[in-house]
Structures are given as structure tokens and as C-alpha cells.
Amino acid sequence: MKHLLSISDLSKDEIVGLLDEADRFKEVLEGREVKKLPTLRGRTIFTLFYENSTRTRSSFETAGKWMSADVINISASSSSVKKGESLKDTGLTLSAIGADAIIMRHPASGAAQQLAQFVAPGGNGPSVINAGDGSHQHPTQALLDALTIRQRTGRIEGLKVVIVGDCLHSRVVRSNVDLLSTLGAEVVLVAPPTLLPMGVENWPVRFSYDMDAEIADADVVMMLRVQQERMQGGFFPSHREYATLYGMSKEREARLKDSAIIMHPGPMLRGMEINFQVADAPRTAVLQQVSNGVHMRMAILFALVAGSDATI
């Protein structure tokens, strides 16, 4: 595996292998006072973010540093991108400096694929990891979500996973649908008609407008943020009406199965798609998702950058 651009790049066995590797990293680091491994010593990793990020960027940086890599962060707002430099020239510059991997977030769908073609023609050059490209894909988020589900429930196959919210603009939902359906989960999308993607009837999912009907027997309920920064025009009448119909209230949380878990890829809008108290409830796995993000991204960097003879 040279790059990680989309969940569709991975076979079922490769997905399971990455989940297992992430669990191994967690086990190795657990209880260590100094969380440091020599696995990527001498490797150089660039994070190149054209959009804001807290969880993804900081967890990739932490993952790289815990593996002893040199991690260099570049923000588009403070680089030559601000002067008009193209994605191609930015990528080639980082490659010439000596990048072993470039982790990129970009507002344009397909940008990660383009970068990989620019910097690694014929497979020679740095690995590219897609940290989110427009509304297209966010493969590392889907992998850490699957890791969290597996840790909480013991399996993924046969589970009913209900994803609620802005499915239209979400790259997370696209990656999760691909991954969870590959691993044998039943995936249901719940949203108002205006926030479901065109062609969703051709996806390997069911879709519904009725949150209460679908979450009653759900094993996992994943809430999504309304991405107002990607919206032009009105997609729902008001925030209050949206929260009433599609928010995870205390009443809805109380009606879930005892074993059901609640997830959210973040950032959360407390009081809109999730109640303030529910966000901190024991069944809510948000902070476990964040913690797993580091171990999952360590596994990804290990697979792409460490080399075939490397050991943890």
C-alpha cells in the first residue's frame, strides 16, 4: 500500500489488519510513562492543511512524534499557498525537501488523488494520506470509528449502525458507509430529504427521515454536525426544528438499547445535534474516538512509511 486516499483503496483484510495494528500500538504504549517508539526514526512527515482541524491534525502529529518521526506542520494560510502557489508545486516542494509522507486536508474533492499523482508518479515519491478532501472521503476517521465500535461491542459484522445528520456534505459518512458495509454492518442514514446525497438509493445503505423509528433497535448511533460552512441557502427551517427532529436528546438517549453506543466524529455542536448531557454520557464514545485516532494513525503511518522489515 503506497497511499491512503479512500476506503475503497483497502480490502476487507487490509482494513482488519489496520484495526489489529492499532490495537497493538495501544497495548504497547499503555502504561508507558514516555510514549515513544523508534519505529519511524529518521522519517520526515508533513501535514498540509488547507482547512482547519483540531482532532485530525493533532492526532497525526502525536502519532508521528510517538513513533520518533520528524513532523512538520504547514498551514495554507501561512505558506506560499497564500501567494498563489499551486497544489502541484507545493507538493513537489515538500517532496524535494525530503518528505516520506504528506498528510493533506483540502476543500476540493479529489485533491488527495491529484497530489499523489503529482508527487509519486509511478509509485516513486512520498506517500499521501487523505485527511479529508471536500465532501468526498475521510478514510482515517472511518478507520478509527470502526476501531471504537469494535472495542465497545466486540464486533462490527451484523450490527445496525444509524448515521444521523448532514449526510449531504459529510465526507465522514461516505467513508463510514464504505468501510462498515465492507465489514458486514447494516448502515442506515437518517436525515431530512434536503441533507441526503443525490443517488443515495444506489449506496449500500437504507435511508430514512424518521430518527425515532431507526434508533429504537440500533447498536450504534453516529451523530453528524450540520456543516453550515458548506451550505448556500436554507436546508432546514430553523436550528430548533432540526434539533427537535434530528437531535440526540436526553429522551431519545433514554430510549436506546442498554448496549447501544453514541458516536460523533467532531466537532460537536452541543445543543443542536446532541444534547449537552448526552455528549458526556457513559454510552457516548466521543473521547474514545479521539484517543483511538492516535493509535489508528500510528498504524496507518506504520503501514505506509515504516517499510516492510519494520517492527513495533
From Swiss-Prot:
Its EC number is 2.1.3.2. The keyword Coiled coil does not apply. PROSITE patterns: CARBAMOYLTRANSFERASE (PS00097). One of its GO terms (biological process) is 'de novo' UMP biosynthetic process. Keywords: Pyrimidine biosynthesis, Transferase. It comes from the Bacteria. HAMAP family: Asp_carb_tr. Belongs to the aspartate/ornithine carbamoyltransferase superfamily. ATCase family. This is Aspartate carbamoyltransferase catalytic subunit. It comes from Corynebacterium glutamicum (strain R). The lineage of its organism: Bacteria, Bacillati, Actinomycetota, Actinomycetes, Mycobacteriales. The gene is pyrB.
